[in-house]
């Protein structure tokens, strides 16, 4: 599907939960076809190869390789809620630590961001 992208359109990528770790792994190991305007990691699972709480499958990555992401993205947004009962809040803090040019958006009562409306995310596209 990447081949079908309009080469003149701005690209923003959004990964939620396991989708977040998928994008982190992909972008830390590969160079995307062009510059990414914004990367949004919403309640992303951190790479826990030893964890029984999260089966990250083949999505585990080397944290030191995350620096490759920063050069491919104009903006990096990490979205986390302190009351997330599926992914630990600390997972998002780890991404923030390893992605120094990222912006972290912290909420207190959004859980795992399963609501049908996410106005704050939408506003970043305006």
Give residue ranges: language-model regions.
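Alpha/beta-hydrolase fold nucleophile elbow
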Residues: 6-16
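Residue in the alpha/beta-hydrolase core beta-strand immediately N-terminal to the catalytic nucleophile
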Residues: 12, 37-40
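Gly/Ala-rich beta-loop-alpha elbow adjacent to hydrolase catalytic centers
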Residues: 14-24
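Active-site nucleophile loop of the alpha/beta-hydrolase fold
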Residues: 39-49
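Conserved serine/cysteine hydrolase catalytic core
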Residues: 61-75, 122
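Short beta-strand/loop motif that positions the catalytic acidic residue
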Residues: 72, 77-80, 84
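Conserved alpha/beta-hydrolase "acid-adjacent" motif
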Residues: 85-91
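Catalytic histidine-centered segment of alpha/beta-hydrolase-like enzymes
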Residues: 110-120
